[in-house]
Each structure stands twice: as structure tokens, then as C-alpha cells.
Amino acid sequence: MLDIKLFRNEPDYLKGKVKLRGMDPKVVDEVLELDGKRRELIGKAEEMKAERNRVSNEIAEKKRNKEDADDVIAEMRKLGDDIKEVDTELNEVDEKLQYRLSTIPNVMHDDVPEGDSDEENIEVKKWGTPRQFDFEAKAHWDLIEELGMANFDRAARVSGARFVFLTNEGAQLERALMNYMLTKHTTQHGYTEMMVPQLVNANSMYGTGQLPKFEEDLFKVEKEGLYMIPTAEVPLTNYYREEVLSADQLPGKFTAQSACFRSEAGSAGRDTRGLIRLHQFDKVELVRFEKPEDSWDALEQLTSNAEAILEELELPYRRVILCTGDLGFSSSKTYDLEVWLPSYDEYKEISSCSNMTDFQARRANIRFKRDKDAKPELVHTLNGSGLAVGRTFAAIVENYQNADGSITIPEALVPFMGGKTKIGPATK
């Protein structure tokens, strides 16, 4: 959520930023109108409560002097009723204001390029060279079924479309990738490993920005009013919700592996085969809590931490900076890492690394003190995939396949695969 002071002090600047996000700049005027009404009602309520205190003192004085206070008591009752009416109106206006504020995205960093879609994202780095095959390469969804590593048909029978059973060496490879990523991030990158709840309440989803705007993308357990997490970013970021941290708790660096659940409401017809776009998938998440002055350097570090996985696995990738039209709701600046997938003959997103500045912290009320006597300030929160496990799985299968139908295990993964260096080939 944005600071209301930004609306009051820099409305024209904010209108320009909102317009680049594809929103009508009039939303800024709507917020200012509600804010003005709210402040007017607060002033009115305070005046009436001061008058009520004066009348209360007058009643007490009359009673001490054994004078008739009926008229003043009647005035007191009317004031009480009027105050209730004003408080009710104030609550209604405040609720409208908070809702309107909650639907407005973060202000993007000045580095973010203007654009309407992902086609206008800008490549800022490329690593590795896509492999040239001297045989007809297969798509990962075909190869893993031939090798007995996955079964999509049985998953569809059990759960529906966009689910998978990983079996035998497929399950082993998925587990190896998760263990490898967590080990790398904890032992070399300085993150603390967490195991997180995979059901969270609405306040947590609000804190990270999924609610109220993106409820249709979520799976909800209606009876309990809980949501299945779309990413471990949600519980990790909310770990410090409603807390004031000490300066020595920053930076806070956490990593967690979790299942992620997404309805993919707007993705009909896209990536319908394979592991790229499932309703349930595994991901290793990175989350950081930073002092405001440190967060932009932290974004570069976090992105490099995710890139280190791709480089050690020797998977060709590129880094792009998202344009205004593709930037996430809560993000001020995002780098996407895209891995080369031969079956698509293009790079596909495997990680998004973002600085949310104080946007999530304001919603979740996460603050810190520079010293014990200092005024609390909002932290900056950052997050990134380190990495999406299923997409890494797919990239390894496609980029490391051999002419005989086998898959070579990347050297970095061999210790996590029990020393195994190859999967397959399939036997008829």
C-alpha cells in the first residue's frame, strides 16, 4: 500500500506513475476526495467530543449546585447520538479509503522501462549458449513419460488438468533439486531455512498484496476461510507481520521450499502440456527484510543468488527487467530470469526477483528501530524464486537429453542424486 502522504504531497507525480501502470489517474483524485472527507469527519468528531466533555462538566456542576440539569442532560444525549452518526460515517469513509488504497499498485522505480506487455521487457544480461542438437530433441513432457519419470494421465484422472505424478527417478530428481537449492542458499548465500504453513489467512494474503485484487487466482478453503499459498513469499513475508524489529535483525534473509497453488485463471490455452504451468508446483523462495537504504543493493544480491543456481547447473539463461505493463502489483522493480527451453525454442521465466520497497511492509505493519529510542520505520521487503523447481526440472531434462533417450545429471546435482550420473535410456 502507498503512503497517503504521497497522494497529498505529490498527486501529479503519482498520477503519472499510475497511468504508466494502466490505471486511470482519476484514482488519485478519488483517494484525495475520500481522504479529505475522512479528515473533515475526524475534525468534526473531535469538536463534538470536546463539546460533550464541556456539557458533561456543566451537568456535574449543576448537580453539585443542586440545579435542574434536565435540559443539559438532553443536550448530552443528542450529542452522543450525533457523535455515533459521525463515527459511523467516518468508519464507512475510512473503509472505502482503505479499500481504494489497497487496489493501487506500487510506484515503480525510475529504472523500470515503459511498455504495455512482456514483449517490451528489456534484456540486461545473457549467460551461456543454447545447445545445438545433432539429433531430434524431445520435449520434456514426452521424454519424462517415456523414462517413467512422470504420469500426466493418471494425475488428470485423480485431480484434473494441470497436475502431475512424478514417479521413480522423476520424484528423485525433484527432491534432489529442492535439496540442492536449499543447501546452496543456506550454506553459501547466508539464508536461514524455514518450513512454512501452506495455508494462510486473509490478513496474510492482504499483507503481501494478493488480496483483495487477485482473489480469483487463489485456491480458498471456504469453511475455514484459509487460502492455499501461491508462493512461500506469503508466509515468509508475514513472519514479522505486526512486529517492530531491532536494527540487528536486519537484514533478515529466509529461504523455504513449499508447494505452490495457483488457479491460473487467466492462462487458458497457455502452456497446456508439461511442467511449465501447473496448479500445484514446488518452488524454493528467497525473502529479505532490509533497511530502506540497503534494499536496491539487496535486489542485485538476491538476483545473483538465483542466477548462481542456473550457472552451477550450466543452464543458459537471460535476465530481463520488467516493463511497466508487466510489473507485478506489489513490486517497484523486478528482474525475471528466463531459462532456455529447446521445446519452445525460447527463454521461459524461471524466477522473478523483486524489490517491494515499503509497499508490503505498510500493509503488514512490519517496522524496525535504528536504536531503542528511535521512531519505528517501515522495512523494505524483497523476494525471488530460487528457483521454480518444476521449470528447472524441465530445463534439465530438455538441455541434458542424449540421442539414446537418456538424461545426463548435471555435475552439481550428482551428490544429491545418490551419485547417479544418468537417467535412462528408456527400455521397450
From Swiss-Prot:
A biological process term (GO) from this entry: selenocysteine biosynthetic process
PROSITE patterns: AA_TRNA_LIGASE_II
A GO term, aspect molecular function: serine-tRNA ligase activity
Localization annotation: Cytoplasm
E.C. code: 6.1.1.11
Residue numbers binding L-serine: 231-233, 285, 385
Record field: catalytic activity: tRNA(Ser) + L-serine + ATP = L-seryl-tRNA(Ser) + AMP + diphosphate + H(+); tRNA(Sec) + L-serine + ATP = L-seryl-tRNA(Sec) + AMP + diphosphate + H(+)
UniProt keyword annotation of ATP-binding present: yes
Keywords: Aminoacyl-tRNA synthetase, ATP-binding, Cytoplasm, Ligase, Nucleotide-binding, Protein biosynthesis
Annotated ATP binding sites: 262-264, 349-352
Comment block on domains: Consists of two distinct domains, a catalytic core and a N-terminal extension that is involved in tRNA binding.
Subunit composition and interactions: Homodimer. The tRNA molecule binds across the dimer.
Purpose of the protein: Catalyzes the attachment of serine to tRNA(Ser). Is also able to aminoacylate tRNA(Sec) with serine, to form the misacylated tRNA L-seryl-tRNA(Sec), which will be further converted into selenocysteinyl-tRNA(Sec).
This protein's name: Serine--tRNA ligase
Source organism of this protein record: Staphylococcus carnosus (strain TM300)
Upper classification of the organism: Bacteria, Bacillati, Bacillota, Bacilli, Bacillales
